Every structure is written in structure tokens, then in C-alpha cells.
């Protein structure tokens, strides 16, 4: 589905790079501009991702006709082809749904004015210190007529947006603490109050950008050329590199090794894949032979929830937010805390009592028409997406593994499925993978390339991007469940 936006209305300023990085092939005037004394920015880094070799991304984008259409749609709608889009190129079915949903949230008719939408995106991304997304939406905020003074800090924004800060904070880091009192405080704030429709729009935006921050860090997305950290004015050290090389597959810089398993023998990582395949086969046989009781499955959930508290990285250090990002939110010390740490007990969220399909979907669609359907489609695509491959193996049913990943994320948020045996999680997800999952979902600003490289070492980069799509959609659904349940309780 083509995005409904005229190309001649596109915002082209941020990514008009072909002129800046001109060459004989694309018609630009690099040499001429330099002779005139114009400082010409050149991209830092080696492509859209710091974790994935550029040539793998560009190869996929150049071979798939569907991708060309999606790229044209994205550029027409946003005036740019950002690095997130380029990394999602591995999974065109998901990318199409993602772009369609994001376009609707930001640009189509809805309860919130356009500049509010981008400012909320800034607030949400800033909670995870995601300067990449903050920079993108600062530009968009100004383009749609936002007041530059608001960008000096949240205290300079309208009180109505300042009031949203508490919900943003809790939703990003400890969504299980959200109550109907949070909702009531926003809906009954006298002249600064939110309508229910506005609040649902805001909640969807917050959860969308919290999750997108996870994808940004989880895939090592590089800064855009027009943003801080994305360019240099120094002469190129290897050869003149032009943006037009993206379209013809030329590369002028050395690529990272294709295999992400650094310092690990091929045989070791091969046996890891074989062991995982064998565990999946054994679990399927156990499923067919006997089924655990409800009491046993409830006990296994509690065990897994407790164990998830002790999954952390050896690199787990506090990251101090830069002032350029931290000014967009309050209480910078507030962050993720494990579900049941310090003896605090929060009741388990049972999906059988409140779920997206039966409750959240209809509430969103009622207050913000069509968005529920778009989000639901995106959830289903991410959850069911499969190419029936695992590393070098083909014709593999990966549904068991995908469900374990999804349910592990929800388990970390205290969300339980009565019909799932949580004993499968420890069988299928090893410690390095759990560390990566928890970091991407809970504290994405702490993700490192070492974490990315250390899990599923024999798997393709496209499969790791697929994992990140599962992580961000499971996270978004978990946040939505807590927020929408609180709204439902307020309404009843």
C-alpha cells in the first residue's frame, strides 16, 4: 500500500545529500563546491548500522523490487530514507506495515496536532537517551511549525505536555506500576486536561518510540549524515565516497567481517545451532507425550520471572544522558527496576483477564479509529514472520522459538499466558541471548556490539534483525497492555 503523500510536498531538506556529496556519476559538484570554499559534510561510519556490514544491507535493497517501491513511498512521505528503514530492508513485509503505521500516527488525521506528535516522539526517545530519534523528530517538529522554545527543555513546553512526563517515565521503565490514577490525573487536569482520544494517541506514540529506541540501539543504527555524530568535514581517507554508491553497490571503505562471531571457531557456533535444533525437537516430543498441569505451569512462570531478575550484563554500567537529550524529560535518575526487586510484590498480569486481541485492540480502535487495526497487523506480522530457516538449516518450524522469545519478554514485565509452559524458555534461550533480550527491551541505551555478536553466533544478520523486530513488538504490546488496562479501569 502506497503511503498517501505527494512527493512535491515532501520534506527534502534533511536528506538532500546527493548535492552535498556530488560526483560525476550523480551530477553533483564536489570538486567545484570545494573550490568555492564550501565545507562539504561526509558520512562517518560504514553504512546504516554499526553492527551489520553495509554491503549486506545494500545487496538486499538493490535486489528486491518491492523494496524500491517501499523506499519511494518512504521518501515521498518523510523526505528522507533513514537508516532504520534501510536496516529493516531485510524484512519487506514487516517494513511495509511499520511504515504504514508510523505514517498514520504522525501525518494522518488524528486527535493530536502534528507538532504535538513529534514532540511526544522526542519525549519518548529521550527517556532511553536515543539521540538518533530525538534528532530526527526535532527536525520534523520544527518543519511542521513547532515552537523552537519548546526544544530548550520540557519545562518550556505547554503544561499539558509536561503533565504527560510522568506517564512517559513509568511506561518506559516500569509499566507494571501504571494505575488508573495516572490516567485520571491527565484527564482531570482542568484547563490542561487530555481527552480520552488524545490520551490514547499519546500512549500509542509513547510505546511506539520507546520500542523504536530499542530497535535503534539493538541494531546499532548509525547517526544520519545531517545529525550530530553522522558526518565529518575532514577529507576522506580512502577515496571519494558518494551517496549514489548506494544505488549501484559500490563501496569505498573496508567492511566489517560478515560473520559476527568474532574470536569464535566456526565449529563451536555450528554446534550451538545443532544443539538448539535438538532441544526444539525434544521439546516437541515432550509436548506430544504429556502436558504439564496448570499448577506446574504457574510455578514455572514464577520461577522464570524470578530468574529474569538476575539476568544482567557484565557491561551493565550507568549511562549518563547528554544535556541535549535529558532536557526533554524529567527525573533523569528514574530507570528500569526489576519487577519484584526489594521485596515489592506486584500481582501477575494474566493475559486471560486482559489481552490485546479481546480488549486493547477494540479500545484503541474505538478512540482512535483504524490505528488498532494497523498495530494489530504489525504485531501479527512480527510474531508470525518466518522463512523456515535457522542459520544454515532450511525447512525449520521456528514457531516454538519465536513464542519463547515473545513470552520471555512479557514474563520480564510480569505478563503470564496460562497455556504456555515457561520451562521451555530456559531450554531454548541461553544466557547470552537473555542478556541481549533484556538489555534491548529494558535498558537499550546499554546495548553493545559485543552483546549483539555474542548471541546466535552462526545466524545471519537478517535473522538477528528479525529477533529485534520480535523484541520491539513484544515490548510495545506489553506497554500497551498496562496502559490500556489502566484506561479501561478508569472508564469503568
UniProtKB/Swiss-Prot annotation:
Induction: Isoform T2 and isoform T3 are induced by genotoxic stress (UV, gamma-irradiation and cytotoxic drugs) in a p53/TP53-dependent manner. Isoform T1 is not induced by p53/TP53. This is Sestrin-1. Keywords: Cytoplasm, Nucleus, Oxidoreductase, Phosphoprotein. Gene3D superfamilies: AhpD-like (1.20.1290.10). One of its GO terms (molecular function) is oxidoreductase activity, acting on peroxide as acceptor. It comes from Homo sapiens (Human). Residues 321-492 are annotated as: C-terminal domain. Belongs to the sestrin family. Its EC number is 1.11.1.-. The N-terminal domain may have an alkylhydroperoxide reductase activity. The C-terminal domain mediates interaction with GATOR2 through which it regulates TORC1 signaling. Interacts with the GATOR2 complex which is composed of MIOS, SEC13, SEH1L, WDR24 and WDR59; the interaction is negatively regulated by leucine. Interacts with RRAGA, RRAGB, RRAGC and RRAGD; may function as a guanine nucleotide dissociation inhibitor for RRAGs and regulate them. Interacts with KEAP1, RBX1 and SQSTM1; in the SQSTM1-dependent autophagic degradation of KEAP1. May interact with PRDX1.
Amino acid at each position: 500500500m502506497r503511503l498517501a503523500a505527494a512527493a512535491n510536498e515532501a520534506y527534502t531538506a534533511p536528506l538532500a545529500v546527493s548535492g552535498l556529496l556530488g560526483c560525476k556519476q550523480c551530477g553533483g559538484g564536489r570538486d567545484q563546491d570545494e573550490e568555492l570554499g564550501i565545507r562539504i559534510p561526509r558520512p562517518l561510519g560504514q553504512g546504516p548500522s554499526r553492527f551489520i556490514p553495509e554491503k549486506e544491507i545494500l545487496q538486499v535493497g538493490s535486489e528486491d523490487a518491492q523494496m524500491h517501491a517501499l523506499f519511494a513511498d518512504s521518501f515521498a512521505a518523510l523526505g528522507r530514507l533513514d537508516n532504520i528503514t534501510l536496516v529493516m530492508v531485510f524484512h519487506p513485509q514487516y517494513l511495509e506495515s511499520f511504515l504504514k503505521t508510523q505514517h498514520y500516527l504522525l501525518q494522518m488525521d488524528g486527535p493530536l496536532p502534528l507538532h504535538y506528535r513529534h514532540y511526544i516522539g522526542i519525549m519518548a526517545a529521550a527517556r532511553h537517551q536515543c539521540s538518533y530519534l530525538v534528532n530526527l523528530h526535532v527536525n520534523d517538529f520544527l518543519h511542521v511549525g513547532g515552537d523552537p522554545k519548546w526544544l530548550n527543555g520540557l519545562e518550556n513546553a505547554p503544561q499539558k505536555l509536561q503533565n504527560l512526563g510522568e506517564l512517559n517515565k513509568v511506561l518506559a521503565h516500569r509499566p507494571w506500576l501504571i494505575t488508573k490514577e495516572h490516567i485520571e490525573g491527565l484527564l482531570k487536569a482542568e484547563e490542561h486536561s487530555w481527552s480520552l482520544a488524545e490520551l490514547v494517541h499519546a500512549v500509542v506514540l509513547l510505546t511506539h518510540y520507546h520500542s523504536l529506541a530499542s530497535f535503534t540501539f539493538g541494531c546499532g543504527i548509525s547517526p544520519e549524515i545531517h545529525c550530530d555524530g553522522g558526518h565529518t568535514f575532514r577529507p576522506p581517507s580512502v577515496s571519494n565516497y558518494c551517496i549514489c554508491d548506494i544505488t549501484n553497490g559500490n563501496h569505498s571503505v573496508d567492511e566489517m567481517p560478515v560473520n559476527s562471531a568474532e574470536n569464535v571457531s566456526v565449529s563451536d557456533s555450528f554446534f550451538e545451532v545443532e544443539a538448539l535444533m535438538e532441544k526444539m525437537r525434544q521439546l516437541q516430543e515432550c509436548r506430544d507425550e504429556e502436558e504439564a498441569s496448570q499448577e506446574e505451569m504457574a510455578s514455572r512462570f514464577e520461577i522464570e520471572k524470578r530468574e529474569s531478575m538476575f539476568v544482567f550484563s557484565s557491561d551493565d554500567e550507568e549511562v549518563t544522558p547528554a544535556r541535549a537529550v535529558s532536557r526533554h524529560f524529567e527525573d533523569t535518575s528514574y530507570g528500569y527496576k526489576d519487577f519484584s526487586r526489594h521485596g515489592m510484590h506486584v500481582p501477575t498480569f494474566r493475559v486471560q483477564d486482559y489481552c490485546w486481541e479481546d480488549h486493547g485492540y477494540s479500545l484503541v480502535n474505538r478512540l482512535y479509529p483504524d490505528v488498532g487495526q494497523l498495530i494489530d497487523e504489525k504485531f501479527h506480522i512480527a510474531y508470525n514472520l518466518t522463512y523456515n530457516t535457522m542459520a544454515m538449516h532450511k525447512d525449520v518450524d521456528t514457531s516454538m522459538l519465536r513464542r519463547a522469545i515473545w513470552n520471555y519478554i512479557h514474563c520480564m514485565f510480569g505478563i503470564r499466558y496460562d497455556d504456555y509452559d515457561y520451562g521451555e524458555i530456559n531450554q531454548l534461550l541461553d544466557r547470552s541471548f537473555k542478556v541481549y533480550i533484556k538489555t534491548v527491551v529494558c535498558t537499550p541505551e546499554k546495548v553493545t556490539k559485543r552483546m549483539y555478536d555474542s548471541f546466535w553466533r552462526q545466524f545471519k544478520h537478517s535473522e538477528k534483525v528479525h529477533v529485534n523486530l520480535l523484541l520491539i513488538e513484544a515490548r510495545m504490546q506489553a506497554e500497551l497492555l498496562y496502559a490500556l488496562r489502566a484506561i479501561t479501569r478508569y472508564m469503568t
